[in-house]
């Protein structure tokens, strides 16, 4: 898959860095993957772009904000790298951003989450195509999952809309709640493939990679740098909600 190319510079983006705020993981590949993703966002936006983490992975938001302030930034946009409006998006992110702003003196603006909109449907379809998954294959859309029913419902709705685009069955499954990947795979007709709703490697993804290998099911990679245009879009939308002058 090709990497993002620089877009014509939007006058709103001048001197306003972007921070991608992810949950974090003990998986050793997370930091490098998110740094690569944010580098791609920086290429699109033409501004400094950094990854920060809520937990388990360094650096945290306060550290990244302090570094940007030391480099002369006065404000930054924080894009939560989350697909659903669950606990992390509604509680953790606002609290972390408030603490980071107070500690660094940086004006931090929270952008919309990545969500499960039509641009995410298009991204998933593109990822499936790039992974060589045939259009007629049914898909397991694998997400982290949440204790919040509405968040899981949003992923089920995303799967339903992806099914319309593909004209082949798509079912959602989760790493932390029902239905499990195996339960969904048992319901899907063959041929079947697995499509992770993950930006990077993760401990919750590793067992599904093993299931795919043992069962002979193709599995697409994490979304990675292909998600950069969506993050860039959330960044630009956030900037357009405030007066930067």
Model-identified regions with their sequence ranges:
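Active-site-proximal alpha-helix that buttresses catalytic centers in soluble enzyme cores
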Residues: 1-245
